[in-house]
Design a protein with these regions (language model features):
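Positively charged, small/polar-rich N-terminal and surface patches that mediate targeting and assembly
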Residues: 1-65, 69-82, 89-92, 96-120
Length: 120
């Protein structure tokens, strides 16, 4: 996604553009989040690891959500088909398995460019 800032009459306008292509731009596991992070993210009843993905085109987040819940015992914390964001929660092994399955479908089957899965 590219961003452009335009200043008109001392007002800033930010325009965000998605470039053509199919790409997983982020695939990350937070293995042991601080308890306060759940509330800050709106994950009120969540426990365990948090998995985060961003995908272009953004509609693929719906596919990622479907694949992740079928692949492992994870819960959808958030999915945004307009921005391509997916947040899942579960135990570390389940979150990692779910993200690997999503990467397999999107990258191996559908030709998306992969991002490395990272973990903190």
């Amino acid at each position: 996604m590219a961003s452009t800032v335009i200043e008109l009459d001392e007002k800033k306008r930010i325009i965000q553009e998605f470039v053509p292509g199919k790409q997983v731009t982020l695939c990350h596991v937070i293995a042991s989040p601080d308890y306060s992070l759940y509330g800050k993210l709106g994950l009120i009843d969540a426990r365990g690891a948090i998995g985060i993905m961003t995908i272009t085109p953004s509609e693929a987040a719906m596919i990622a959500a479907d694949v992740s819940t079928k692949a492992a015992a994870v819960e959808i914390g958030f999915v945004d088909r307009f921005n391509g964001s997916l947040v899942i929660t579960g135990d570390v092994a389940a979150v990692e398995a779910a993200l690997r399955s999503v990467m397999q479908v999107l990258c191996d089957m559908m030709g998306y460019s992969p991002a490395p899965m990272t973990k903190t």
